[in-house]
């Protein structure tokens, strides 16, 4: 095994340790809180009281039987569910295109659930006022609707009139995907000025996040003042609340690995926003919310404001589309592409492009790997020549080391002089490695976080490229009727990866150091166990990359 492969192994192990260790153990540094003026602070305190009252039913203090709640049915190509006419709450939403798992009878993914259910999760937008005498729609308000069904072809119009004759109108539309648009209009038919603030909130009962997903962000997220704000559930639990005073809020929400619920406020003003945690009656809840400045509506005047709610799958092209169409900054960053974002997203685009032609993401991975190999061929050729020269110079280097073993400065001078004389660059062999590491992690991220790869099949027994190989040699790949423990789930693709790695070693010159050569012989076996639990799509990439490297090495050996 040559020094290039040794460097690759060491670099990958080191990079894995740094990336996983950093994301798992290091708590993100607290962001500095902005100084708030006295008026803003008063508004924040008022908002906290108002929004607390708005979500109080979600804590279980007020519970209404679901059968008694009037609802508007949601029906589109992507969604089914309903909106509660009591309080105008989005609390019943199912993603029709996605199943919980690959089993035949698997149910569809449910995103939103009513406040009094086990997995309560809902969104709402509305109005509050800093005057208690102003009667506004609230959680107990029963709205009147002109339709019982909301669909992309048929918006819903709702209205409610208070005791002073002030009319509140709401128009809700939904597109073919996951975006709701809510336009609120207030018609002030009273003889008094009407101070109002628009708000939006998403409230969720906490569901434990598995440690295995600490390599990606889950929890409150948003784009505030054109900066991405990410806080884990633990971050917000420790802080209780993270506040952002009057800011430009492009969007805020709560994200899962594949699903996102987010509020997209009107761009007409700045908003105060919060990421909150609360524990009531033993129930942990998280909430993200925003509220606008006070808007004074004079008698006889109207006021309208538009907000949007995204609730659905984090499809890359869909988030890109909304980001461009509605100027929603950093909306695609709801997908955690990680540190190598500038590489990971183009890698996804390439895979998705070829998927459009071949209809299989596994085949798309193979094609992208070939392209990467072709782009790196010249670099790999130069690297191999450099390593061959280094191999030939090893006896002379050993002689110099013995000669100047007591004089390190002279030793380094003589070795560098030898490199210069023979026109050898000692780091040339590392260049392909530096390219392969970000590509490796980018493909891993694409497989792990994109909804497009979720339950995407390859061929044969591979039904989900984002999951580990489901077979294992320890039950003869399913022939024996028992399931080994997870650490013994050594499937066919991990074995193929180890075999191709071993063959690649055989194609390469052994290290000059006998001890190092012995250690390297065990690396395929170590990697076999180390990567057996990784997404099988990554093992397909690595196995195919090894095969291409063997072919490339054969070509270079023959013609050089």
From Swiss-Prot:
Q: Which Pfam families match?
A: 60KD_IMP, YidC_periplas
Source organism per entry reads: Rickettsia rickettsii (strain Iowa)
What is the protein named?
Answer: Membrane protein insertase YidC
The major lineage groups are: Bacteria, Pseudomonadati, Pseudomonadota, Alphaproteobacteria, Rickettsiales
The subcellular localization recorded is: Cell inner membrane
Return the similarity comment. Answer: Belongs to the OXA1/ALB3/YidC family. Type 1 subfamily.
Whether Ligase counts among this entry's keywords is no
Q: How does it assemble?
A: Interacts with the Sec translocase complex via SecD. Specifically interacts with transmembrane segments of nascent integral membrane proteins during membrane integration.
Q: Where are the transmembrane segments?
A: 5-25, 334-354, 357-377, 431-451, 476-496, 522-542
Q: Which GO terms describe its biological process?
A: protein insertion into membrane; protein transport
Keywords on record? Cell inner membrane, Cell membrane, Chaperone, Membrane, Protein transport, Transmembrane, Transmembrane helix, Transport
Q: Name one GO molecular function term.
A: membrane insertase activity
Bilayer topology annotation: Multi-pass membrane protein
* Highest taxon of the lineage: Bacteria
């Amino acid at each position: 095994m040559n020094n290039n492969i040794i460097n690759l192994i060491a670099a990958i192990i080191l990079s894995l340790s740094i990336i996983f260790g950093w994301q798992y153990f290091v708590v993100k540094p607290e962001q500095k809180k902005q100084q708030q003026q006295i008026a803003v602070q008063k508004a924040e305190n008022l908002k906290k009281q108002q929004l607390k009252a708005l979500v109080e039913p979600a804590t279980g203090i007020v519970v209404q039987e679901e059968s008694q709640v009037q609802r508007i049915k949601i029906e589109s190509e992507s969604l089914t569910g309903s909106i509660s006419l009591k309080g105008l709450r989005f609390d019943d939403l199912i993603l029709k295109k996605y199943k919980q798992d690959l089993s035949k009878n698997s149910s569809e993914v449910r995103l939103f659930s009513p406040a009094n259910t086990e997995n309560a999760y809902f969104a709402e937008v509305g109005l509050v006022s800093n005057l208690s005498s102003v009667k506004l729609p609230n959680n107990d308000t029963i709205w009147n609707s002109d339709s019982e069904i909301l669909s992309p072809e048929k918006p819903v119009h709702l209205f409610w009139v208070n005791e002073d004759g002030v009319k509140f109108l709401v128009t809700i539309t939904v597109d073919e995907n996951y975006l709701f648009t809510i336009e609120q209009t207030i018609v002030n038919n009273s003889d008094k000025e009407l101070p109002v603030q628009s708000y939006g909130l998403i409230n969720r009962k906490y569901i434990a996040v598995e440690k295995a997903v600490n390599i990606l962000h889950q929890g409150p997220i948003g784009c505030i003042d054109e900066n991405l704000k990410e806080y884990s559930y633990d971050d917000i639990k420790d802080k209780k609340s993270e506040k952002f005073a009057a800011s430009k809020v492009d969007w805020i929400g709560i994200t899962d690995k594949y699903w996102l619920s987010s509020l997209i406020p009107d761009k007409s003003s700045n908003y105060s926003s919060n990421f909150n945690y609360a524990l009531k009656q033993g129930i942990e809840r998280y909430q993200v919310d925003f509220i606008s400045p006070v808007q004074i509506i004079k008698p006889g005047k109207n006021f309208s404001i538009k907000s949007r709610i995204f609730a659905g799958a984090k499809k890359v092209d869909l988030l890109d589309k909304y980001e461009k169409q509605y100027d929603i900054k950093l909306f695609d960053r709801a997908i955690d592409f990680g540190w190598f974002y500038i590489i990971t997203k183009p890698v996804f685009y390439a895979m998705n492009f070829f998927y459009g032609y071949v209809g299989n993401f596994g085949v798309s991975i193979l094609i992208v790997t070939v392209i990467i190999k072709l782009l790196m061929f010249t670099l790999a050729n130069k690297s191999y020549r450099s390593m061959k020269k280094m191999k030939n110079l090893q006896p002379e280097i050993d002689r110099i080391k013995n000669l100047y073993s007591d004089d390190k400065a002279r030793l380094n001078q003589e070795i560098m002089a030898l490199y210069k004389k023979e026109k050898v660059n000692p780091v040339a062999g590392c260049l392909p490695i530096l390219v392969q590491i970000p590509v490796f992690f980018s493909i891993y991220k694409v497989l792990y976080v994109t909804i497009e790869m979720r339950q995407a099949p390859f061929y044969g027994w591979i039904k989900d490229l984002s999951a580990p190989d489901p077979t294992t040699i320890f039950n003869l790949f399913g022939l024996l009727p028992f399931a080994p423990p997870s650490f013994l789930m050594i499937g066919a693709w991990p074995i193929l990866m180890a075999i191709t790695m071993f063959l690649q070693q055989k194609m390469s010159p052994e290290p000059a150091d006998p001890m190092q050569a012995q250690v390297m012989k065990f690396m395929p076996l170590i990697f076999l166990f180390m990567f057996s639990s990784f997404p099988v799509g990554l093992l397909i990439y690595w196995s195919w990359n090894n095969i291409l490297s063997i072919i490339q090495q054969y070509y270079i050996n023959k013609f050089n």
